[in-house]
Amino acid sequence: MTQEGTLTALREGERAQVAALLTEGGMRRRMQDIGLIEGTEVECVQKSPAGDPVAYRIRGALIALRAEDSARVLVTGC
């Protein structure tokens, strides 16, 4: 993945860097608090059988995000 897309496009084992957050207010703050800031590397670790939620490794922590939240994170591939 070398172009921009959302975090939902990552497959298990793929990594990308956060380019932007497509949300404002409290949700933006929550995402920043868990480490989703510009330039941070994110790895898709595991997708649940139904595809929602998805576990991501963010700054060494394993974080589960719902698909609707992952769709608000713009990433650029590695």
Enumerate the predicted regions with their spans.
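Amphipathic, hydrophobic secondary-structure cores in small proteins
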Residues: 12-68
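Glycine- and charge-enriched low-complexity intrinsically disordered segments
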Residues: 51, 71-78
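SH3-family beta-barrel domains
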Residues: 1-20, 76
